[in-house]
Amino acid sequence: MKLIVGLGNPGARYRFTRHNFGFFVLDQLAEDQDIMMSQTGFDALWGKGVIAGQSVLLAKPQTFMNLSGKSVRKLADFFKIVVEDVLVVHDDLDLPFGVIRLKAGGGQGGHKGLISICDSLGGPEFQRVRLGIGKPAQRSAVERYVLEPFTESELRILPRIIVTARSAILEVISSGIKTAMNSYNGMVINDLIQEV
């Protein structure tokens, strides 16, 4: 079984913020695959299904970003999922908006949700779908920036990014992370928002 985790913060206040990018993609994946994420427990909203012949568990931790690992660890332990079968979908300040990068293992880039997951799972070997959100002009503004909503120009292209990220996840499930990396890691989806 694969555990696919979308990162974000619960509650209406954070619903449309950049930090909830992972939630957006997971919601799209669940809708397209007819997987109801209505189960509660393990500090998450979650649901089980089958994609490309493989059992999958989709989950959105409800712990707030900085404690995401608590939920991921509970799910992985209960369903006996090894760290290499965990795929985390998250926003990434180090990538421009419109860029998606797939990655297996590696550093956390200062992302507090990833740090929490790495600490909770005992290592960084989980897979990631990194969703670029760009950076604010001033480094000191990062905390505010990730909790702001997307701009109007970003919103125009957001659906395309979400659908592309969903397709990348499907390829990870069906063909493996390396094949999906070859397909998606050179892609840039920002032709409509050069002004951002």
Swiss-Prot record:
The record marks 9 as: Discriminates between blocked and unblocked aminoacyl-tRNA. GO terms for cellular component: cytoplasm. It catalyses: an N-acyl-L-alpha-aminoacyl-tRNA + H2O = an N-acyl-L-amino acid + a tRNA + H(+). TRNA binds at residues 14, 64, 66. The record marks 91 as: Stabilizes the basic form of H active site to accept a proton. HAMAP family: Pept_tRNA_hydro_bact. Monomer. Hydrolyzes ribosome-free peptidyl-tRNAs (with 1 or more amino acids incorporated), which drop off the ribosome during protein synthesis, or as a result of ribosome stalling. Catalyzes the release of premature peptidyl moieties from peptidyl-tRNA molecules trapped in stalled 50S ribosomal subunits, and thus maintains levels of free tRNAs and 50S ribosomes. This is Peptidyl-tRNA hydrolase.
